[in-house]
Amino acid sequence: SKFQDFWTNKILNPHHKILAEDEIDEIARILDKRAKGNKPGSVHVANLNINPGAMRKMFNDIKNNAPLAKIMKDIFLESNQEKRGGLIDQLYKNNKKKPRKINQLTTPEAIPINAMLCAWDPKKNISIASLRHREMLIDHFEFEGDTDFKNDSDGEKIVKSNDQIINGFKSLGLK
């Protein structure tokens, strides 16, 4: 996918020193409905509602913070959901440290992380990026599962709600 290529060849590549605005804007259009250059009918993952300057800063900050970029790569590649949840918790914890905190990355609603997970692998990650919207959907359809939106860690909420919704729709006969 374009997002995987961007992550591997731009974010993680030490020889690619600077992210160009147009490179980030292309990825922003994949992630965010309101990204610069998106038009009605454009395909996108979510409505991040992050302004272009903040989006560019977020990706440049990730690129310039090798430990966080590596944790995110590990999150994308981890197939065990429990381990993935732990890595997400580690990302949230590490991103709280000043002065290197990356704004917009680890939010209470987890929208940027969930959008990136979906862009990385849309077959295994849902495009409902907001945890609040996931909770509303789970409640509405009464999907079985054990996501505790009040007490689970950020990582647990992200991976459990993703799986709960996928399994819930499968139980309704949808693939």
What are these regions (language model features)?
Residues R100-C118:
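Helix-hairpin-helix
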Residues S1-T106, K123-K175:
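An N-terminal alpha-helical hairpin/helix-loop-helix interaction module that forms a charged
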